């Protein structure tokens, strides 16, 4: 009996052990199937050579955008900062003192030379004129009487009834009266002139500014307080300076065209305000700044330029014919100077050193190092290496903005 019990106990233990082993094997197979990567056609098997996955992939080609160098006739300009100045500017003041009786202009009005601008109280000057005329009449009467007496003295002197001294005294009295007449006439002219000055007229044609004094105020003659300022607005001048090293270009260009074209742009250097011509060049260079002053003159029927306005100036000097031009984005700067990335027929890039003739916000004129019809990289230069093959991509066109029909109708 005891042997049978031991046999059954051993048999039970063996069965339990087999069940545990079978469960462990099943768990291991389940875990292996879930963690193994899916097999694809490209996955290495026993039938393929043994090599790493990373070695079977090539790095992607860097995408770039390109532009083609062109050949153009490019005008060359010298740029400068300028200030608008009126060709003529007059501060209108009164020549005589008195109360301001009237103003005959509107602020900002265009006036012509000789137009009446203001009136000073004329009555004091009318009184002075009347006094001068009265004094003239008095002295004329005195002169007439002195001449009659002189005629009598001359007759009496022939009969020796008056002395020669008395005759000479009477002749001097006549001359004295004649001198008084001359003084009186000058006084009349002065009084008439002062009366004329009481009416203030425009000395030049131009635009009046804001009035500086109101009607009713007492004005002193030659006062430092102006009545108004008149600026000639058509044409106007722009004063600007250039470095002395640019003077030779200006002199050479003026030999072919004394009136070089000049363009005035706004403060932001974007909007063209007026077109004019170079008017004059100063006769000396400022030793402190190393610059020379120039003046350009601009006709302006629309009055786009105002005195003391700040403008950007572009002075035309020459035209580069058949120059090689590339976009500004294609030009790069390195330790050795300017260069561009050129793309060949196999879409491989190479670094090419170039010399720049001129440059603006949009284009670069190449002096040497690049020919026309070569492809240059304009975007994606940061990822390029010498001889690398690139993928040329086209920039996406901006999406057209759709207009809400309701909003457009309201607008």
From Swiss-Prot:
Any one of the GO CC terms: plasma membrane
Topological category with respect to the lipid bilayer: Peripheral membrane protein
Region Disordered: start-end pairs: 35-64
GO molecular function (one): efflux transmembrane transporter activity
Keywords: Cell inner membrane, Cell membrane, Membrane, Signal, Transport
Keyword Lipoprotein part of the UniProt annotation: no
Domain of life: Bacteria
Record field: compositional bias (Polar residues): 35-55
Localization, UniProt: Cell inner membrane
Annotated signal sequence range: 1-26
Record-linked InterPro entries: CusB_D23 (IPR032317), Multidrug-R_MdtA (IPR022824), RND_pump_MFP (IPR006143)
Main location group: membrane
Tagged with keyword Membrane: yes
PANTHER family in alphabetical order: MULTIDRUG RESISTANCE PROTEIN MDTA
Complex and partners: Part of a tripartite efflux system composed of MdtA, MdtB and MdtC.
Similarity comment: family membership: Belongs to the membrane fusion protein (MFP) (TC 8.A.1) family.
Protein's name according to its UniProt entry: Multidrug resistance protein MdtA
Organism annotation: Proteus mirabilis (strain HI4320)
Gene: mdtA
